[in-house]
């Protein structure tokens, strides 16, 4: 991964064989990012995304491998109990035009991933919500 910071905006290149969530965490810790939005696109050959069942309060994961274009990767970097936390969703399409997506659990870059991180002044922590079973923004 390489990146360049321009004020509160960080332009990131995640390289072949690097795992996206690991690189986002490394960047956030290195740059002391407590709150930010994330947008990206690129290519992956292995990824896992989940879909949350609200009734069961459980994620169901789907893993894909092959040639995929990341058509959208979006979400937030923030904190939970004062520690790094990220919530990203990703959609990726294959050579048949099929697109798969959900809550990002893991994605390995096959060529490149181009990311823009918009750092916000402030902190928004998360806390577990027993009603939804999710870690929600705490204001």
What is each PLM-predicted segment?
Residues 1-86, 91-139:
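N-terminal intrinsically disordered, cationic/polar leader segments
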């Amino acid at each position: 991964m390489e990146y360049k910071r321009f004020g509160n905006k960080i332009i990131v290149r995640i390289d072949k064989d690097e795992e996206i969530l690991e690189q986002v965490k490394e960047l956030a810790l290195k740059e002391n990012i407590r709150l930010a939005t994330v947008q990206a696109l690129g290519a992956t050959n292995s990824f896992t995304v989940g879909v949350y069942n609200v009734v069961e309060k459980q994620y169901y994961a789907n893993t894909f491998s092959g040639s995929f274009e990341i058509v959208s990767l979006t979400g937030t970097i923030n904190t939970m109990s004062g520690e790094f936390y990220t919530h990203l969703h990703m959609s990726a399409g294959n050579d048949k035009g099929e697109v798969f997506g959900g809550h990002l659990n893991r994605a390995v870059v096959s060529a490149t991933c181009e990311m823009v991180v918009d750092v916000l002044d402030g902190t928004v922590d998360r806390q577990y919500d027993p009603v939804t079973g999710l870690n929600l923004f705490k204001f």
